[in-house]
Amino acid sequence: MACGIPWKLARRDELMATRQAERPGEYFPPPYPPCPPTVVTPLRTSAYDFPEATFVTRPCLPAKKATGHKNVFERLTDTAYYTGSHRERFDEFGNGRGIAGREYLYAYDGLTESPSRCHEVYSSVIKRPRKPVVTPGTLGIQRFGVQIPAPRLMWLYRNGDKHDDGTPFFVRPYIKSMESLYQQITKEITPIAGPVRRIFDQNFRVITDLDDIVDGAKYLCTSGEPPAAYDRLEKFLSEWVIQKSQTKVPSQFFVV
């Protein structure tokens, strides 16, 4: 058996050489190199097994882009980022235009980005004056008659009544004199000491003519006596009433 093995090997070599001679175009690539040995890595079960643990040092974050804003509020209030019709709310210096920039601009020349449209408003919108119902002239008087003036409002206060909140009274056109005004006011407020004989404004000036009455002002009604003490006229002397610009408040009247 030992002598037959070399013969078989020689026979095999002859057969392989014969096959290669019969098929000269066939190419047999060389065998692949052997695989490297497998390295077994032990399993790491906790973060302490990693020498590069992330909790030891703070991770390096990417650098932020420089935008020129300190915080998010400066970014939101930057007028350079407003587009469309909202950018018309600010002028070229970034200052707000007020109500002129908040109006609906399309009511004037449309919402458009075309430079040919003058859609920038630099002042508040001025409302167009409405035409009067009655045209002044002879024709209006013939059709509608003479227009009477609107009644003036007076806030009446009783002298010495510190709890009086005021009584509204309208000076109608049929009141032609101060005596007629005194009679109508007496029926309206029922004064304490008697009928109304004298009327004072907030500057403690006596009203002697109907033309001196200011629409919406306060007036103190007395029966001829002087005004009461200051502590009983606090509501009457409050500052919410309209007075004439030429009137002055003398300080000697406010001595308690």
UniProtKB/Swiss-Prot annotation:
<dbReference type="InterPro" id="IPR003533">
    <property type="entry name" value="Doublecortin_dom"/>
</dbReference>
<dbReference type="Pfam" id="PF03607">
    <property type="entry name" value="DCX"/>
</dbReference>
<dbReference type="GO" id="GO:0005856">
    <property type="term" value="C:cytoskeleton"/>
</dbReference>
<dbReference type="GO" id="GO:0046785">
    <property type="term" value="P:microtubule polymerization"/>
</dbReference>
<dbReference type="GO" id="GO:0035556">
    <property type="term" value="P:intracellular signal transduction"/>
</dbReference>
<keyword id="KW-0206">Cytoskeleton</keyword>
<dbReference type="Pfam" id="PF05517">
    <property type="entry name" value="p25-alpha"/>
</dbReference>
<protein>
    <recommendedName>
        <fullName>Doublecortin domain-containing protein</fullName>
    </recommendedName>
</protein>
<feature type="domain" description="Doublecortin">
    <location>
        <begin position="152"/>
        <end position="226"/>
    </location>
</feature>
<dbReference type="GO" id="GO:0005737">
    <property type="term" value="C:cytoplasm"/>
</dbReference>
<keyword id="KW-0963">Cytoplasm</keyword>
<dbReference type="InterPro" id="IPR008907">
    <property type="entry name" value="TPP/p25"/>
</dbReference>
<feature type="region of interest" description="Partial p25alpha domain">
    <location>
        <begin position="71"/>
        <end position="103"/>
    </location>
</feature>
<dbReference type="InterPro" id="IPR036572">
    <property type="entry name" value="Doublecortin_dom_sf"/>
</dbReference>
<comment type="function">
    <text>Specifically required in the formation and maintenance of the conoid fibers; the conoid is a component of the cytoskeletal apical complex, which is composed of a left-handed spiral of 14 fibers made from a nontubular tubulin polymer. Promotes the organization, curvature, and stability of the conoid fibers, and probably bridges other conoid components to the tubulin core.</text>
</comment>
<dbReference type="GO" id="GO:0015631">
    <property type="term" value="F:tubulin binding"/>
</dbReference>
